[in-house]
Amino acid sequence: DALLARIEQAIADLDYRPSLMARGLKRGRTRLIGLIIADITNPYSVNVMSGIEAACREKGFTLLVCNTNNELDQELHYLDLLRSYQVEGIVVNAVGMREDGLNRLQQSALPMVLIDRKIPDFACDVVGLDNAQAATTATEHLVEKGFEAILFLSEPLGSVNTRRERL
C-alpha cells in the first residue's frame, strides 16, 4: 500500500498523463479516424464533418480533421500523416488523389470511404448521390413547372468528377 501511495503521489506531483498514442500503438488500436476534406469552409463540408464526428464519438473514436484547401499536394501529405498516426480508417472528401496517392492507399489496406467523390478504377466504399439521376429529376421538375430557360450553376468543375456528373 505504501508503494502504491508513493506512485499515486508521484503521478499527482508530476501531473502525469498517460500517452494515448503510445497505449494505442502498443494495443494496435488507436481509436483514431482520419478525415481528409477538400474545403473546410464549404457549408456542405461543415455538415459532413459534423455528422462524421458525431458518429465517431458515438463509437468511441476520435476524428482527426485534415483540410486540404483543394490542393492535391496537401492530400498526399495528409494521407502520409494519417498513416503515420496509424489511424484505423480514413474518410476522404477531397479534390482527387493522384495515382501515387491511390497506390499508397491500396497498399496500406486501410478501410476507406469516399464522400461525394468517385475515383475511377479504385475499389472502395462511396457515400454520395446518383448525380446524373438527381440532375435529371431536378431538371424534369423545373420543366414540369413550366420553366424553359434553365441555368446550371456550380463551383468550378476542376478535377471533381462528381460535379461533371451533374451537368
What does each model-found stretch correspond to?
Residues D1-R31:
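N-terminal helix-turn-helix DNA-binding module of bacterial transcription factors
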Residues A12-D15, G51-T62, H77, R83, ...:
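Bacterial carbohydrate/catabolite-sensing allosteric modules
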Residues P18, R27-T41, K59-F61, E155:
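Interdomain hinge and pocket-entrance segments immediately C-terminal to HTH DNA-binding domains
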Residues R31, E88, F147-I150:
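Short acidic/polar active-site loop segments enriched in Thr and Asp
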Residues I37-A54:
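N-terminal winged-helix
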Residues D39-N42, N69-N70, G96, V143, ...:
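Short histidine/acidic/glycine/proline-rich micro-motifs that form metal-
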Residues A54-N103:
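Central regulatory/effector-binding core of bacterial HTH transcription factors
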